[in-house]
A protein has these predicted regions:
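N-terminal Rossmann-like or analogous alpha/beta NTP/dinucleotide-binding catalytic cores
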Residues: 1-123, 192, 219-233, 307
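Residue-level signal for inorganic ion chemistry
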Residues: 27, 58, 98, 102, ...
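Short acidic (Asp/Glu) and glycine-rich catalytic loops that position anionic groups and cofactors
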Residues: 36-38, 202-207, 255, 285-292, ...
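Conserved phosphate-binding loops in nucleotide/dinucleotide-binding enzymes
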Residues: 81-85, 188, 206-217, 245-306, ...
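Active-site cores that bind ATP or allylic diphosphates and position pyrophosphate for catalysis
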Residues: 97, 105-106, 110-264, 294, ...
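A glycine-rich phosphate-binding loop feature that marks nucleotide/adenosyl-phosphate handling sites
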Residues: 242-247, 325-336
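Small-residue-rich helix-loop
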Residues: 365-504
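Charged substrate- and nucleic-acid-binding regions of tRNA-handling and nucleotidyl-transfer enzymes
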Residues: 488-551
């Protein structure tokens, strides 16, 4: 039985698009489902690009998502090299064979001559079919054209009659009319080969059994099949995926239409949420990569790769009408091409965010801890001698959990106390931490207890305008001071406050809001008693002192 081999063949564009990820993921899942191999090949026939620099975000993005290739850049394999720019001799050999066997020809037509033929066909309301007037099939004909200063491209000599029928694994039977095909260029005048030839040669030489790709390549299939047949290659099976569409639209999703997408409320919320996090860790939000159409956006903000995989898998594929939440192993076990829809799937920012929330809630505390550290370090809320750089992009997505930390705002805390503070904060925050970067919403817990930020409007309302606030807080401070450090828990402080309110005949609103602003500087936030436990007895009392001094 032939081993299933799929491939993802991106051009080094400098970014990894959501649509590209969906193609790569489906190729990966299909290969793994069938105990096969997933190959990464780089289609770098465009000589104008800096391949190494432009390729890095693509490789990093795939690895972050866990879409690991079995062969390709960085890992090698039996068919190396995996860059088209390093396989030019193979393409030239294919061109020479196509010409020698009459399936391709040298063409010396000038651009204006081709345009004149197109214009004539348009005027006659007929399909443009190149006349082949400038085709050279002998050395003598080539010499005559070249004596006129013309340079040749190489074109396929496509059939002009009959039909081609392919059995697409997603779309079923698709029929093409050969008369509608052009004599496509496969080699430029400078000798460089075009994508269509290189793809066919590489797919054959790499033993690709299934070409799973975007539907925009469906129209390329006839010329590629013609090349393969002409070279005596066995054809792979084809599966053309529907494109990923814009939010609430059926137009193809594009990274260049960010301004348009920002008019969509959910898309705008996704971007604004990301910007709040990015600004705190020094990321450039105007950069090309900071765009929800690009995968790196989610990595920078702190989404989980498994959540992105889960959501993207459902852009065009579904197991049934009910099941939605899958881990990667589940997807590998369940994925089949016959469940891929033919219609475009619209990118839904709200649904993606919901998947992230679900996966984040299920993440164990230890994993959350390792992920939020990157943001705390980059925002200088914690520090560590074991970290060479706190520049966000220099830090790994998951930090070692045994790293020794200090808190610049509270240098008296031991590394163990800093870790406990962070872990208690994560637990208390619960579903408020929707992405790892959301830990920065709780920066007040890392601030100095003698100089923490206070919302002045809340302070004025709850402290200045309440004549009884100062006296009540002073007495409450004394009650809290009587609790031993190891007993200073949410349950203990809550019991104390309820007893205090009963004794003073207070309603909760008469003290709880003042207590919150005195200890956290905010009018809203985590559960009051969970917040006190996170701060601990010593820090809580220091904050009381700071607040009472401010009142005085």
């Amino acid at each position: 039985m032939t081993t299933v081999r799929t491939r993802f063949a991106p051009s080094p564009t400098g970014y990894l698009h959501i649509g590209g990820v969906r193609t790569a993921l489906f190729c990966y899942l299909f290969a793994k489902k069938n105990c096969g191999q997933f190959i990464l090949r780089i289609d770098d026939t465009d000589q104008q690009r800096n391949v190494e620099e432009a390729l890095a975000p693509i490789l990093d993005g795939l690895r972050w998502l866990g879409i690991q290739w079995d062969e390709g850049p960085l890992v090698g394999g039996p068919y190396t090299p995996y860059y088209q720019s390093q396989r030019l001799e193979k393409y030239q050999a294919a061109v020479d064979r196509l010409i020698a066997e009459g399936n391709a020809y040298y063409d010396y037509a000038l651009p204006e001559e081709l345009q004149a033929e197109r214009d004539a066909a348009l005027q006659a309301k007929t399909t443009f079919v190149y006349s082949r007037r400038f085709m050279a099939t002998t050395e003598q004909e080539r010499a005559q054209f070249e004596a006129q200063g013309r340079k040749a491209v190489v074109r396929l000599k496509m059939p002009r009659t009959g039909k081609l029928v392919i059995d697409d694994l997603i779309r079923g039977e698709v029929t093409f009319d050969w008369a509608m095909e052009q004599d496509h260029v496969i080699q430029r005048a400078d000798g460089s080969c075009l994508y269509h030839l290189a793809n066919v040669v590489d797919d054959y030489e790499f033993g690709i059994t299934h070409v799973i790709r975007a539907e925009e390549h469906l129209s390329n299939t006839p010329r590629q099949i013609f090349i393969a047949h002409s070279l005596g290659y066995e054809l792979p099976r084809y599966a053309h995926l529907p494109f990923v569409a814009e939010p609430q639209n059926k137009t193809k999703l594009s990274k260049r239409k960010l301004d348009k997408y920002l008019k969509n409320r959910d898309f705008a919320k996704l971007v604004e949420h990301g910007k709040r996090i990015a600004d705190r860790v020094g990321l450039q939000t105007e950069a090309d990569g900071f765009n929800p159409v690009i995968v790196d956006f989610y990595r920078q903000v702190g989404y989980l790769p498994e959540a992105i995989d889960n959501y993207i898998a459902l852009l065009g594929w579904a197991l049934d009408d009910k099941a939605e939440y899958f881990m990667k192993d589940d997807l590998i076990e369940l994925f089949t091409l016959d469940r891929v829809n033919k219609a475009p799937a619209s990118f839904d920012p709200a649904k993606l965010f919901a998947f992230q929330e679900k996966h984040m809630l299920q993440l164990p505390l230890e994993n959350k801890y390792s992920r939020v550290l990157r943001y705390l370090l980059a925002a200088n809320l914690v520090a560590s001698d074991g970290v060479a750089s706190t520049v966000f992009t220099d830090l790994p997505d998951e930090m070692p959990i045994n790293i020794m930390l200090s808190m610049p705002g509270c240098p008296e805390l031991s590394p163990g106390q800093v870790r406990t503070t962070i872990e208690k904060l994560i637990v208390a925050a619960g579903d408020r931490i929707k992405v790892s970067g959301d830990i920065l919403d709780f920066a007040d817990f890392f601030a100095s207890d003698t100089d923490f930020p206070i919302d002045e409007k809340v302070w004025d309302k709850r402290i200045v305008q309440d004549a009884n606030a100062a006296a009540l807080l002073k007495e409450l401070q004394e009650r809290f001071a009587a609790i031993p450090e190891d007993k200073f828990t949410a349950a203990e402080t809550e019991a104390l406050l309820h007893a205090f309110m009963e004794e003073k005949e207070l309603k909760p609103a008469q003290i709880i809001h003042a207590l919150r602003v005195v200890t956290t500087g905010k009018g809203v936030g985590l559960g009051m008693f969970e917040a006190l436990e996170i701060l601990g007895r010593a820090r809580t009392l220091k904050r009381f002192e700071t607040a009472l001094a401010k009142i005085a």
